[in-house]
């Protein structure tokens, strides 16, 4: 009896395809609470039962957008059934991705540290000359 072999990186490929398809399907939604949404990443469980869809919002309230996307998750999943060629299409769970906010905060902290360092460097040579 032959056993099925696992296809290498299948989970990653399925997640990538879901990301592309969900991004296209979201553009078709008519809900005004869903603004300019970017799908950042998708994480699929090994059994393909659930998928976390991480998104960011350019304009609009992230909480309202998450609520609207989670309400539309059933419609989106049904549409994925028609597009994907897999046995189990995962249940979609939308989560706001704070990576861009954290990156902006870190960038501001780095800029502030560099400005402080430059100010300290300017102050030290003047103090040693006097």
UniProtKB/Swiss-Prot annotation:
Q: What's a Gene Ontology MF term here? A: ribosomal small subunit binding
Question: Localized where?
Answer: Cytoplasm
Which Gene Ontology cellular component annotation is one that this UniProt entry carries? cytosol
Which organism encodes this protein? Methylibium petroleiphilum (strain ATCC BAA-1232 / LMG 22953 / PM1)
What does the UniProt keyword field contain?
Cytoplasm, Ribosome biogenesis
Q: Which InterPro entries does the protein's record reference?
A: KH_dom-like_a/b (IPR015946), RbfA (IPR000238), RbfA_dom_sf (IPR023799)
* Protein's name according to its UniProt entry: Ribosome-binding factor A
Its assembly, as annotated, is: Monomer. Binds 30S ribosomal subunits, but not 50S ribosomal subunits or 70S ribosomes.
């Amino acid at each position: 009896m032959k056993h099925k072999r696992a296809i290498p990186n299948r989970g990653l490929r399925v997640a990538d395809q879901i990301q592309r398809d969900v991004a296209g399907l979201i553009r078709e939604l008519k809900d005004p609470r869903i603004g300019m949404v970017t799908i950042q990443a998708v994480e699929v469980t090994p059994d393909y039962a659930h998928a976390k869809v991480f998104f960011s919002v350019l304009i609009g309230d992230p909480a309202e957008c998450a609520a609207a996307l989670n309400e539309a998750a059933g419609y989106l999943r049904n549409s994925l059934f028609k597009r994907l060629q897999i046995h189990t299409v995962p249940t979609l769970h939308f989560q706001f991705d704070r990576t861009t906010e954290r990156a902006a905060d870190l960038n501001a902290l780095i800029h502030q540290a560099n400005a402080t360092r430059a100010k300290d460097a300017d102050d030290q040579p003047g103090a040693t000359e006097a």
